[in-house]
Amino acid sequence: MAERPEPARIALPRSPSSVGAARRFIAARTTAWSFPEPAADQLVLIGSELVTNSVLHARTALTLTLELRNDRVRISVKDR
């Protein structure tokens, strides 16, 4: 990747359906960013675990962010 893409964000409701939406979002981003399949699959799993935790324990909607930082990917989930 020559240029670092902008962080990718999605707002999600505090709902069990958000876990599937997060998985699809992460899969689409990792495909667009040309990640190899094993790494992309791991990111989908990690992201869905983070969203599941927020759905279970947060009291508000949440935001999932994916960010490329040099040779690393940062996944964050914040409740509002």
Which residues make up each language-model segment?
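Hydrophobic packing within well-folded, soluble alpha/beta domains
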Residues: A22, L50, I75-V77
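Histidine-centered phosphotransfer motif of kinases
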Residues: Q42-T60
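STAS-typified acidic loop motif
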Residues: R9-R23
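Conserved short strand/loop->alpha-helix "switch" segment adjacent to the catalytic nucleotide/phosphoryl-transfer site
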Residues: G20, R24-S48
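Conserved beta-strand-loop-beta-strand hairpin that lines the nucleotide-binding pocket
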Residues: M1-A11, V55-R80
